[in-house]
A protein has these predicted regions:
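Non-catalytic cap/lid and distal C-terminal segments of serine-dependent acyl enzymes
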Residues: 1-263
Length: 263
């Protein structure tokens, strides 16, 4: 791809201290496969005690997407240097989870929720000593990652205090979709949304950020979900960006969200 200049230069590498990226590999008992995630640690501070954001990519991508095309680590380095945010860590997992079914492997995006809660969060937080409690933990994702985020935070509101839904969906448009769900399940009944009926739902989260591009191919679905958000009385920060279903929207989404959380 061609690297175009960034107007605010937040996604461009500058001569400042930079954080580190570490690739972690583990054998998952849930997917029965070797899995991986990337950990970003900010520069010049110990990892112990830091807040951590669990950040998910979209359909067809992988755990490297947020730091290659997304430039998330560069954006955070620059925001930290500018004093716009307090340092926090990132954990970026492969959300295209492949489940072994006989001799074949099939996509099962739903497994990520269990893998995060039962394997990735305990493993990462034990090793790096960040997070450790709801107040120091958030989750965000783009497109498919927004589906995984919404399902996870609705099922486990006790684990996260910050939520980012980029080009995002609160309904799962993958499970049971013959074009996307390789597992071949029946359409999902969106049972996770019942969590939003809890009178205390808004008290669970400091930030509930939902956004999309004004030329996104899924904009109509996003607007439909406005009504669900309003009906359930969810307190959200909502923003429409110029652009489509691509990184020209997701980088600004992430940049803005990073300045809202862990304050």
């Amino acid at each position: 791809y061609i690297e175009l200049p960034d107007e605010k230069k937040l996604a461009e590498i500058r001569d400042i201290p930079h954080g580190t990226l570490t690739h972690e590999f583990y054998k998952s008992e849930i997917s029965n496969n070797w899995e991986r995630f990337i950990v970003y640690l900010p520069p010049c501070v110990p990892s112990a005690g830091l807040p951590v954001l669990y950040l998910q990519h979209g359909f067809g991508e992988s755990e490297i997407s947020w730091t290659t095309t997304g430039k998330a680590n560069i954006i955070l380095d620059n925001l930290i240097e500018m004093g716009k945010i307090k340092p926090f860590a990132l954990v970026m997992s492969d959300g295209m989870v492949q489940e072994k079914v006989g001799s074949e492997e099939r996509l099962n995006h739903v497994l990520l929720e269990r893998m995060l809660v039962e394997e990735i969060i305990p493993m990462a937080e034990k090793k790096y000593q960040f997070g450790g409690c709801k107040e120091k933990r958030g989750m965000a994702g783009l497109s498919m990652g927004s589906v995984q985020t919404t399902r996870t935070i609705c099922d486990h509101p006790d684990l996260f205090s910050e939520v980012g839904i980029f080009s995002g969906f609160i309904r799962d448009n993958i499970e049971g979709n013959p074009d996307r769900d390789a597992v071949g399940r029946k359409p999902y009944e969106q049972t996770h949304l019942k969590a939003m009926d809890d009178p205390d739902f808004n008290n669970y989260f400091h930030t509930f950020f939902r956004c999309i591009g004004d030329n996104d191919c899924f904009l109509s679905r996003f607007l439909e979900e406005d009504a669900i958000i309003q009906e359930k009385g969810v307190h959200e920060i909502r923003k429409i960006y110029p652009g489509g279903h691509d990184w020209n929207v997701w980088r600004p989404c992430f940049t803005d969200f990073a300045q809202m959380i862990f304050r």
